[in-house]
């Protein structure tokens, strides 16, 4: 039984979400290429990146995830700069979009080990934003390191009108589905331990 879970991510949001489950973590960020391959469907993209992250980090039990905002089939990753964040926010303004997270749990046990994964989708309805709102928000710096250029758990939450599905997925890690994958990998959650 793995006593410690390795999180293959430097995301403070994923760390905070897992802390809500009472999990002791070892943080080992994965160094992987997160570019979308030509013609790669968004679901395949987030799952591929999550798997690559999980495989790139040593450990008995490794958890990795990748989140993307998808609008009209286009993956909106983290903005390159403030202008790119403005472009993304203008595109999201007044629309419904999807947030996809690929989650991978890799357990190195026995001769073969186990790799379990899932893709979770959440639909988000965004308010109509004017240039003043967009400029103010980009000026806060908050959207510059977030997929799709917004943080539902921060000031960007003021622009979200509706969420269908997992809110924690939009933050960066679907907790219910992640807990289910950990259980299937033989990792008991804190409330299941003697």
From Swiss-Prot:
Keywords: Cytoplasm, Hydrolase, Nucleotide metabolism
Required cofactor(s): a divalent metal cation
BP GO annotations: nucleotide metabolic process
Gene3D superfamilies cross-referenced by the UniProt entry: 3.90.950.10
Site (Important for substrate specificity): 13, 67, 153
Catalytic reaction annotation: dTTP + H2O = dTMP + diphosphate + H(+); UTP + H2O = UMP + diphosphate + H(+)
Location of the active site: 66
Gene Ontology CC, one term: cytoplasm
Enzyme class: hydrolase
A Pfam match: Maf
An example molecular function term from Gene Ontology annotations: UTP diphosphatase activity
Main localization (coarse): cytoplasm
Protein EC: 3.6.1.9
Subcellular location: Cytoplasm
UniProt-listed InterPro entries: ITPase-like_fam, Maf-like
NCBIfam families reported for this sequence: maf (TIGR00172)
PANTHER family (UniProt xref): BIFUNCTIONAL DTTP/UTP PYROPHOSPHATASE/METHYLTRANSFERASE PROTEIN-RELATED, BIFUNCTIONAL DTTP_UTP PYROPHOSPHATASE_METHYLTRANSFERASE PROTEIN-RELATED
Role, per record: Nucleoside triphosphate pyrophosphatase that hydrolyzes dTTP and UTP. May have a dual role in cell division arrest and in preventing the incorporation of modified nucleotides into cellular nucleic acids.
UniProt family annotation: Belongs to the Maf family. YhdE subfamily.
Protein name: dTTP/UTP pyrophosphatase
Protein source organism: Anaeromyxobacter sp. (strain K)
Lineage: Bacteria, Pseudomonadati, Myxococcota, Myxococcia, Myxococcales
């Amino acid at each position: 039984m793995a006593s410690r879970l390795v999180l293959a991510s430097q995301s403070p949001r994923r760390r905070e979400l897992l802390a809500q489950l009472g999990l002791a973590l070892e943080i080992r960020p994965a160094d992987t290429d997160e570019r979308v391959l030509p013609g790669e469907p968004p679901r395949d993209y987030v799952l591929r990146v999550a798997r690559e992250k999980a495989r790139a980090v040593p450990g008995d039990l490794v958890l990795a995830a990748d989140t993307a905002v998808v609008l009209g089939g286009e993956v909106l990753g983290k903005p390159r700069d403030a202008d790119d964040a403005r472009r993304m926010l203008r595109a999201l303004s007044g629309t419904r979009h999807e947030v996809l997270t690929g989650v991978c749990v890799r357990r190195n046990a026995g001769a073969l080990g186990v790799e379990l994964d899932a893709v979770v989708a959440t639909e988000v309805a965004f308010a109509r934003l004017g240039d003043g709102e967009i400029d103010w928000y980009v000026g806060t710096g908050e959207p510059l390191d977030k997929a799709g250029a917004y943080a539902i758990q921060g000031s960007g939450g003021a622009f979200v009108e509706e969420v269908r599905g997992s809110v924690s997925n939009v933050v960066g890690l679907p907790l219910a589905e992640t807990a289910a994958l950990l259980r299937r990998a033989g990792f008991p959650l804190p409330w299941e331990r003697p």
